[in-house]
């Protein structure tokens, strides 16, 4: 069985029932200037129990496609956001 990819990010918004949008930051080296720059990407995550709120830090794990853009399932909520 292949290892499932895990991503960690911050919940931006609840995109609907059982769906959250998370922002994932990664650091890559610039090819010319050899400086680390931040790159951001948004993912849709399946939240079966509707337990996330905007600002939460979460971990999601890759799964089978649940919709056209949703390929991750919520694994854990690491920290609650300040509201």
UniProtKB/Swiss-Prot annotation:
Keywords: Ribonucleoprotein, Ribosomal protein, RNA-binding, rRNA-binding. One of its GO terms (biological process) is translation. GO terms for cellular component: cytosolic small ribosomal subunit. It holds the Pfam family Ribosomal_S17. One of its GO terms (molecular function) is rRNA binding. The keyword rRNA-binding applies. InterPro entries: NA-bd_OB-fold, Ribosomal_uS17, Ribosomal_uS17_bact/chlr, Ribosomal_uS17_CS. PANTHER family: 40S RIBOSOMAL PROTEIN S11 FAMILY MEMBER, SMALL RIBOSOMAL SUBUNIT PROTEIN US17M. Part of the 30S ribosomal subunit. Belongs to the universal ribosomal protein uS17 family. One of the primary rRNA binding proteins, it binds specifically to the 5'-end of 16S ribosomal RNA. This is Small ribosomal subunit protein uS17. It comes from Campylobacter concisus (strain 13826). The lineage of its organism: Bacteria, Pseudomonadati, Campylobacterota, Epsilonproteobacteria, Campylobacterales.
């Amino acid at each position: 069985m292949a290892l499932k990819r895990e991503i960690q990010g911050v919940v931006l918004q609840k995109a609907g029932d059982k769906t959250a949008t998370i922002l994932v930051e990664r650091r890559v080296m610039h090819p010319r200037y050899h400086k680390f720059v931040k790159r951001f990407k948004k993912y849709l995550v399946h939240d079966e129990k509707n337990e996330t709120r905007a600002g939460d830090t979460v971990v999601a794990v890759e799964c089978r496609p649940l919709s056209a853009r949703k390929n991750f399932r919520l694994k854990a909520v690491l920290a609650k956001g300040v509201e």
